[in-house]
Each structure stands twice: as C-alpha cells, then as structure tokens.
Amino acid sequence: MPVLTDPLQLLQALIRCPSVTPYEAGALSTLEQILTKMGFNVKRPVFTDKNTEDVENLYAKMGGEGRHLMFAGHTDVVPPGALEDWTYPPFEGVIDQGKLYGRGAVDMKGGIACFVAALARILEKRSIKGMVSLLITGDEEGPALNGTVKLLKWAEQKGEKWTAALVGEPTSVKTVGDVIKIGRRGSLSGVVTVKGRQGHVAFPERAANPLPLAGKLIQALTQTALDRGTENFQPSNLELTTIDTDNPAVNVIPAQTTIRFNIRYNDVWTKETLMTEIEKRLASVQLKNNDYQYPYYQLEWIPSLGSVFITKNDKLIKTLSNAIESVTGNIPEYSTSGGTSDARFIKDYCPVVEFGLPGQTMHMVDECVTLDAIETLTSVYERFIVDFFA
C-alpha cells in the first residue's frame, strides 16, 4: 500500500497497472483500495453497449451535507506502441533524473494521484465540511460509450448532485498552472461516399468517374471558412482525414471514393446548424449525371457525444485561479483550445473546469512528468479543495 499523502508512490502504483483501454488491469482495484482506506464509500459499476467491450468504472464518495465537489478522470491509457522504443518499460514507473516515466504519467494517472494525495494531506489535519466524490472511468481514451456518460447518469439515478467538478486532464502547457480549460469545442464527423460506375479508362463514356465530383465536393467543404472565431473560442476548423478510392489499377475508372472529415466547432454553431451548413455546401455542387445516373454522393454523419460548451461560473474559476496563483505565482490563461474531454458530459450536470499537469509528452513514447510538477499540482489541488469548502 503506497503512502496516501505521497503522490509519487500513488502514481507509480497506478502506472504499474497496464490499463490500456478498455482493460482495467488492476488500476481501479488499486484506487479502490486506497480510497477505501481514506474513508470513501466505493462503487464499481460495469457498463456495456452493443459492439463494445464491457468497461469497469469507479464512483467513490465521502463526507456529509454541504457543497459537493466532484473530481473526474480516467485510469485507462493509450497503447504504449513499440516497447523497444521506450527508454524505460512503460508500465514500471521508473524515476530518473527528476522525472517519472510511464504510460499515463501525464494522461491522466498523474492527476488522479495528485488529487488523492492532496485530499489525504487535508484529512490528516481536518475533516471536509461537505462532500467529495471521485468519478473515474476506464473508457475515456476509447469510444467513451461505457464510461463517464453512463457513470454520470447512474450516479444521478442514485440521487447524486454536484456543486462543481474538477477534471484532472493535462491542461498545463509549459508549467503547472499556466493554462486551465473553461470550455471545449464540439466535434462532428462525417463520411461522404461518391458513387460512380467502374469501367475501362479507354471507354469513359461507358463509366462514371467519381473522382472529379469528389474534388468539387471537397472544394465546397473547404474553400470558405466556417467562421472567424468568437470571444472565447478559436475559429471552427474542418479537416479532411481520409480520401479512399481503393483502386491500385491505372487503367480502371474506380467505382467509388470515400471522403472522411472532422469539424471542431465553436459556439457560433450547434451540432444541428452545422450539419445543415455542411449539407447546404455539398448540395451546391452541380451533379452532371450520364445515362447511368452516376456519379452521385451520399453523406453519413458519425454519431457523436457532447457538444461545444463554456463554463461561466466565475466563483469556481476564480477559486481555482487563486489557488494556482498562490502556489505557483502564475496567473493562468483561460482556454477552450484543444480536443474534447469528458468535461463535455459533466457540463450537463454541474459547472466544470479542467486543470492538470503539463501535457507535452502525453500519448508519446517516454511519456513522463517531472517530480516538481507532481508536487506542485498536489499543492494546488490541496489549496483548491480547502478554498472550495471554506
């Protein structure tokens, strides 16, 4: 059993569990053992969905009446890749020259270890005048179907309500406390399949080449910016991710080609208005069908969870900002940049902010965190918890 007030020992214990999504691999069991010793009531619901693996989750709660602070995170990690590329084994938690190495050190077992250690330090001195809960999933790096979104609904059905939430994702950039996330852009993905008619290149009149139409559709999607950004968000961006024709032959006109794209969108749009805009752009392309009624296109939207949001709870943001400044001297930047996170689900239940370790090495070979950063984040979390319940 690691020392509860030592985030390094806690982090090493978690890293030594190879919990690549969707496998628990002992990570939640280790956390359950630690939290139970601290006085938490721990539950381990398992969720499933069609065509997905069952996923274990953890919900732990302590305290009585009053304000309720949720800490949210995940113990699942991305695959380490080629083991021979790592300086140290990715699931051993080796410390060398002031850094702790391991998959999940930054994203985001480090944040969990720091929060637990911070709370343990407080409990050595005083009790919490309120409630603290940890909402931890094993399905954040994967489809995110059997994790936080279902865990929140499960907890709500049991009567849980939260005053605010802190997500321990690695939001800092260069140093602990330089950036906190107060919102996130939405994500929308689609697939455009352009149907043609296969044929010999020497007889184009007998075929229908989908590629020229695909080029026009791509131009319609990308030639005009979606927007110029807003006060809190950078401009929305549409990125083509694949163009697949699957035709290695140089003398064959292909039967079809597929265009996949993703849009990260700001608060100019809702998911519905953005879908309408994309459909309008595609429809602006004139189809020139031959006698076979080809080519033509089909648009399919890929189901997505969560949408763009901004947290406007000034008290929550200020409490966190003041804690950061008092410990580090940094006045954090309020940001909405980057990818999505499980905060997109939590915002439907309570105000949420995100703050954690510097994320330069997340998902990389030799993912690591400095020992100084771990101690600093623990101190900030400790100050934030105390101030939250003051």
Swiss-Prot record:
E.C. designation(s): 3.5.1.18
Coiled-coil intervals, chain numbering: none
Chain residues that bind Zn(2+) 2: 107, 141, 363
Residues binding Zn(2+) 1, per UniProt: 74, 107, 169
Cofactors: Zn(2+); Co(2+)
Keywords linked to the UniProt accession: Amino-acid biosynthesis, Cobalt, Diaminopimelate biosynthesis, Hydrolase, Lysine biosynthesis, Metal-binding, Zinc
Catalyzed chemical reaction(s): N-succinyl-(2S,6S)-2,6-diaminopimelate + H2O = (2S,6S)-2,6-diaminopimelate + succinate
Pathway in which the depicted protein is active: Amino-acid biosynthesis; L-lysine biosynthesis via DAP pathway; LL-2,6-diaminopimelate from (S)-tetrahydrodipicolinate (succinylase route): step 3/3
InterPro entries: ArgE/DapE_CS (IPR001261), Bact_exopeptidase_dim_dom (IPR036264), DapE_proteobac (IPR005941), Peptidase_M20 (IPR002933), Peptidase_M20_dimer (IPR011650), Peptidase_M20A (IPR050072)
PROSITE patterns per the UniProt record, alphabetical: ARGE_DAPE_CPG2_1, ARGE_DAPE_CPG2_2
Pfam families recorded: M20_dimer (PF07687), Peptidase_M20 (PF01546)
GO molecular function, one term: cobalt ion binding
UniProt-listed GO biological process terms: diaminopimelate biosynthetic process; L-arginine biosynthetic process; lysine biosynthetic process via diaminopimelate
SUPFAM superfamilies named in the record: Bacterial exopeptidase dimerisation domain (SSF55031), Zn-dependent exopeptidases (SSF53187)
Gene3D superfamilies: 3.30.70.360, Zn peptidases
Cofactor: how bound: Binds 2 Zn(2+) or Co(2+) ions per subunit.
Catalytic residue positions: 76, 140
Quaternary structure annotation from Swiss-Prot or TrEMBL: Homodimer.
Family: Belongs to the peptidase M20A family. DapE subfamily.
Summary of the function given for this chain in its UniProt record: Catalyzes the hydrolysis of N-succinyl-L,L-diaminopimelic acid (SDAP), forming succinate and LL-2,6-diaminopimelate (DAP), an intermediate involved in the bacterial biosynthesis of lysine and meso-diaminopimelic acid, an essential component of bacterial cell walls.
Classification via PANTHER family: ACETYLORNITHINE DEACETYLASE, N-ACETYL-L-CITRULLINE DEACETYLASE
NCBIfam families: dapE_proteo (TIGR01246), PRK13009.1 (NF009557)
Protein name per Swiss-Prot or TrEMBL: Succinyl-diaminopimelate desuccinylase
Species this protein is from: Bartonella quintana (strain Toulouse) (Rochalimaea quintana)
